[in-house]
């Protein structure tokens, strides 16, 4: 909740000047929606960036499904959204520590030796 940055699409990211604008728009967030383009996540390590990307992409899919249904919907109150976001932030074991080992084990089963 209010932890995602936004950046307007500027065409192909060939201009080095866009790097500074991306950095400024990220503004300390770890997740960004690149309008009309895609998603961007950063983290202390690959596990954190991947976990954030997985959650953000899933959230976008849910929103698209809800909007595509054409049915009325309601959002939870702002204070409840903030409370839930803070609970997730304060969770004793970060997602990257819960999910990453299992994801690596699954990848090793599907593609043995991928990490060599």
Model region roles, listed by residue range:
Residues 1-116:
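Glycine-rich flexible loops
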């Amino acid at each position: 909740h209010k932890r995602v940055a936004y950046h307007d699409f500027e065409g192909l990211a060939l201009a080095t000047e866009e790097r500074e604008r991306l950095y400024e728009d990220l503004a300390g967030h770890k997740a960004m929606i690149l309008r009309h383009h895609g998603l961007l996540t950063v983290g202390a390590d690959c596990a954190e960036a991947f976990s954030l990307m997985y959650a953000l992409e899933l959230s976008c899919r849910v929103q698209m499904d809800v909007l595509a249904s054409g049915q009325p919907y309601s959002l939870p109150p702002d204070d409840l959204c903030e409370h839930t976001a803070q609970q997730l932030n304060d969770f004793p074991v970060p997602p990257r520590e819960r999910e990453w080992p299992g994801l690596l084990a699954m990848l090793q089963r599907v593609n043995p030796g991928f990490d060599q």
